[in-house]
């Protein structure tokens, strides 16, 4: 009987481990949703690694390195012309939200959707990380508008 119990427990752990949801981002455009899976972002041909300084109140600045896709390049992949919009909202799984102007997003080498920090894939909030995706605004001098756990982009 004990042997059957252990087999049952192992089976449950195996099945729940296999059902883990893969990271993705929903892009809402004019009332229509498009889902971008993690693999599309992780393997994007325009993904780059860049230095950044993480600043947090009460802590010393930390030099780090992120890897991600510049938003303008990601939108090109989706055949989206964002110049027709005024602003773009970014929502996180923890309820946080920021809104950026299209002009700021169009600034070269400024706004990135990142998936790696210091060579390691960003972990989800559930696993204690800032991912699976984090929006980095390189010209934000105090990193106050960076948003972790990004799961939705809304073009407005």
Placement of each model-derived feature along the sequence:
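Sec-dependent bacterial lipoprotein signal peptides
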Residues: 1-16
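N-terminal intrinsically disordered, low-complexity segments enriched in P/E/S/T
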Residues: 18-156
């Amino acid at each position: 009987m004990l042997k059957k119990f252990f087999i049952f427990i192992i089976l449950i752990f195996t099945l729940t481990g296999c059902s883990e949801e893969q990271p993705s981002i929903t892009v809402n455009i004019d009332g229509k949703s498009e889902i971008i899976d993690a693999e599309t972002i992780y393997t994007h041909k325009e993904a780059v690694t860049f230095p950044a300084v993480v600043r947090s109140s009460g802590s010393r600045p930390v030099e780090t390195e992120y890897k991600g896709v510049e938003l303008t390049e990601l939108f090109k992949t989706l055949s989206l012309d964002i110049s027709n919009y005024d602003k773009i909202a970014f929502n996180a799984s923890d309820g946080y939200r920021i809104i950026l102007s299209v002009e700021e997003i169009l600034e070269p080498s400024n706004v990135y959707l990142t998936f790696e920090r210091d060579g390691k894939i960003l972990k989800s909030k559930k696993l204690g990380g800032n991912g699976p995706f984090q929006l980095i605004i390189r010209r934000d001098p105090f990193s106050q508008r960076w948003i972790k756990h990004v799961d939705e982009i809304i073009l407005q």
